[in-house]
Amino acid sequence: NVVANGVNLNKFIGMERDYTFRRKFAMDNEKIILFMGRLVNEKGVQHLIAAMPKILAGYHDAKLIIAGKGGMIDELKAQANALGLGSKVYFAGYLGGKDVEKMYKAADISVFPSTYEPFGIVALEAMLAGVPTVVSDVGGLNEIVEHEVDGMKSYAGNPNSLADSIVSLLLNFW
């Protein structure tokens, strides 16, 4: 039988956090907020970057890692620079193979701020890796996370709502 939209349940069994890998992206005291996916408008990364000043006001030792590639990369980098986020946002580029799994294990929070998302395999993978997850209240993401039970939801396209959910996890989960 084929299971549509499934994930390999054995993918992260026995896998520990690789601190050497993690230190490529953040200092030990920093909490990694991870976005992994295509850098296109509907993935909502621009809203996550817009949320960072409020996130940092609520939790200074946070760092956003953006892993992926896509047509918005230059626009997103310019947005981060315009907001003065400098060392608090890191563009990791495309990750493949075992680096994807290592990055999930390195993350403290994963965020999927899509404005349109039919399903959201990446959110399932993050949750399977044991990473607290924030998703938008749209499409399939809305169906896989129960707010404040197995993740947090935020209003799609709303940086303030996104920041509130992320800061809540940073302050209360860790």
Where are these regions (language model features)?
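Carbohydrate-associated surface elements
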Residues: 6
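A short helix/loop element that forms part of the nucleotide-sugar donor recognition site in Leloir-type
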Residues: 13-26
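A conserved mid-protein helix/loop that constitutes part of the nucleotide-sugar donor-binding site
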Residues: 31-54, 64, 71-77, 160
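Nucleotide-activated donor-binding/catalytic signature segment of Leloir-type glycosyltransferases, i.e.
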Residues: 75-95
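Short alpha-helical donor nucleotide-sugar binding micro-motif in glycosyltransferases
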Residues: 94-95, 102-107
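Aromatic "clamp/platform" in nucleotide-sugar-dependent glycosyltransferases that forms part
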Residues: 115
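Short hydrophobic beta-strand element within catalytic cores of glycosyltransferases
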Residues: 132-135, 145
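Conserved acidic donor-binding segment of nucleotide-sugar-dependent glycosyltransferases
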Residues: 147-148, 152-159, 168-174
